[in-house]
Amino acid sequence: MIRDITIGQYVPGNSLLHKADPRTKIILTFIMMIFIFLINTYWGYLLLTLFTAITVVSSNIPVKFVLKGLKPILFIVVFAGIINIFMIKGTVIWSWGFLSITYEGINVAIKMAIRLFLLIITASLLTYTTTPIALTDAIENLLAPLKRIKVPVHEIAMMMTIALRFIPTLLDETDKIIKAQSSRGADFDSGNMIERAKSFIPVLIPLFISAFRRADELATAMEARCYRGSEGRTRMKQLRFTRFDVLVTGITVVFMTWVILMEYVFF
């Protein structure tokens, strides 16, 4: 389960999506997320799924690797789906005592699952195809207008990127701790859900210690390289919008607008 969490990892590649300006990818990711919540019909979700599938294929990221990142949220999807199926009132399909399954509940559960899967894949594609440095530069550039009101834009962008980058690092450390404790007789697989959750408590203390140690090492390394924030800093690679970025943004906006018009005007 721990190794199945792939969001935050960068997958080296030479696809057009890897070469695209990181600002374009961030903007399109937010646009996609907004439209995921605006769509409320199955044919709309079908179109968004096809669009997402085309994006995944064009990124040259292995489909199995992308689907692997969905495994950690399966429990959340199933749990929330069961609650929706039994709690939402409507046309009863099946009932037993005080429990009843409704058509509306099933409908909401399916749509919620589709939304969560699309959101995770969309957010993951951003980190799969963008290096942490490029992501930091892009966030700082997009938030640049806030500098006029004395907002520490560079520091905010740096913290966001480091936090995102630490996800796979901490997950890898968690996996190592679990394996080390398992070799000493710890059991994380037997018992009910509550017992399994309790068995992970001994993992938390060494994990927190490791996290603080890694954070201290990172701070020391940054100071050793004379890092002093954004003042006077230059970039090895300057961000530039290309025709490809304009083309991709235009196609995405036109496609999403068409889907919304079909959703709210024609249907």
From Swiss-Prot:
One of its GO terms (molecular function) is transmembrane transporter activity. Pfam families: CbiQ. This is Energy-coupling factor transporter transmembrane protein EcfT. Keywords: Cell membrane, Membrane, Transmembrane, Transmembrane helix, Transport. Transmembrane (T) component of an energy-coupling factor (ECF) ABC-transporter complex. Unlike classic ABC transporters this ECF transporter provides the energy necessary to transport a number of different substrates. Forms a stable energy-coupling factor (ECF) transporter complex composed of 2 membrane-embedded substrate-binding proteins (S component), 2 ATP-binding proteins (A component) and 2 transmembrane proteins (T component). May be able to interact with more than 1 S component at a time. It comes from the Bacteria. The chain crosses the membrane at residues 26-46, 73-93, 116-136, 151-171, 247-267. It is a multi-pass membrane protein. HAMAP family: EcfT. GO terms for cellular component: plasma membrane. It is found in: Cell membrane. Belongs to the energy-coupling factor EcfT family.
